[in-house]
A protein has these predicted regions:
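Conserved ABC ATPase "signature" region
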Residues: 123, 127, 134-152
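Hydrophobic anchor residue at the start of the ABC signature
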Residues: 170
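Conserved catalytic motifs of ABC-family nucleotide-binding domains
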Residues: 177
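Catalytic Walker B motif of ABC-type/P-loop ATPase nucleotide-binding domains
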Residues: 181-185
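ABC transporter nucleotide-binding domain
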Residues: 199-296
Length: 334
């Protein structure tokens, strides 16, 4: 049982989020003439806790259950089984109270009204949350200054770049001054400079005392931002620790990084059959390909690399210390 404590003049639970054995099953109808229903478990058994003031990461491959978990915690989906509390409120019984106290920031360009200005967008969402008119306009100004868009506040959102729209998403998610913010891949599709600015804003929010649950596909981002990270695979949490703690899963390995040209999918598949290869990832671009091979052998495997890639052009081979991404790959592929 989570005890209550005093904070900022009111009683609250010690944990901002408590998820206990959450499960979500969807009914999927298949067939054209003979239609049959199939039960699909999107989230099978998810349990974790998030402290107040923590930036907690939830990472996993596509279809692992990240978004479904977020939707249950933000009251957009009802769990099939299990329980969860958000800011001390039950996600099934206290829907309105939770929605008043949380913010949701999505990646991408959806969720904004592009034919009106940033100010008009924020006024609209402030009114939906019931923000008092006496503080609304001042808060909008503060938020637009925080995201660096005050000088473009009266321009139509359709004239904004993708990065500017993402910053406006952040302001929208903060308009009700939420205690807890859910960020679903907030830097997806952004160029490196804008993504870096977005990560800086996220850090500043934590410094201001906000609690954040972040989903991301970028392991370096989770490593940089998160106090703890949960890795979800096939609807279940397979690991939960600090970034440095997760790296211990691959402390006995090295990463052989091969930069080359002409590397094929068939050659990548060959590496997966090598006995001492724990995981393989490949970025097969048009002009340059990067192959990352996780193995306990390190430099001892170079001769095998050269043999398998004898028909490809190899520019460079490096032996690197494992990163959070390497730990992630090992956990989600094994």
């Amino acid at each position: 049982m989570t005890r209550k404590r005093r904070g900022r003049g009111e009683s609250r639970l010690e944990k901002a989020i408590v998820a206990g054995h959450l499960c979500k099953v969807f009914s999927v109808t298949k067939g054209t003439f003979r239609r049959t229903k199939t039960q699909v478990g999107a989230v099978k058994d998810v349990s974790f806790e998030v402290d107040y003031g923590e930036l907690f990461g939830l990472v996993g491959p596509n279809g692992a259950g990240k978004t479904t978990t977020i939707k249950m915690l933000t009251t957009m989906l009802i769990p099939t089984s299990g329980k969860a509390t958000v800011l001390g409120y039950d996600v099934q019984r206290d829907v309105t109270k939770i929605r008043q106290k949380i913010g949701i920031i999505l990646g991408g360009e959806r969720g904004l009204y592009t034919r009106v200005s940033a100010i008009d967008n924020l006024r609209y969402f402030a009114d939906l949350y019931g923000v008092s008119s006496s503080i609304r306009d001042n808060r909008i100004k503060e938020l637009l200054q925080f995201i660096g868009l005050w000088d473009r506040a009266r321009d139509r959102v359709e004239t904004y770049s993708k990065g500017m729209k993402q910053r406006l998403h952040i302001a929208r998610g903060l308009i009700n001054n939420p205690e807890l913010i859910f960020m679903d891949e907030p830097t997806i599709g952004l160029d490196p400079e804008i993504a870096r600015e977005t990560r800086k804003m996220i850090k500043e929010l934590v410094e201001k005392g906000k609690t954040i649950l972040l989903t991301t596909h970028y392991m370096f981002e989770a490593d940089e931002l998160c106090k703890r990270v949960a890795i979800i695979r096939n609807g279940e949490i397979v690991a939960l620790d600090t970034p440095s703690g997760l790296k211990k899963y691959v402390i006995d390995t090295r990463v052989v990084e091969v930069e080359g040209f002409g590397i094929t999918d068939k050659e990548v598949a060959e590496f997966k059959e090598v006995s001492d290869v724990l995981s393989v990832s490949a970025d097969l671009g048009e002009n340059k390909q990067i192959l990352k091979i996780q193995t306990p052998k390190g430099s001892e495997i170079i001769s095998e690399v050269q043999e398998i890639l004898k028909n490809s052009r190899i520019y460079d081979i490096k032996i690197k210390e494992p990163t959070l991404e390497d730990a992630y790959l090992r956990l989600v592929t094994n």
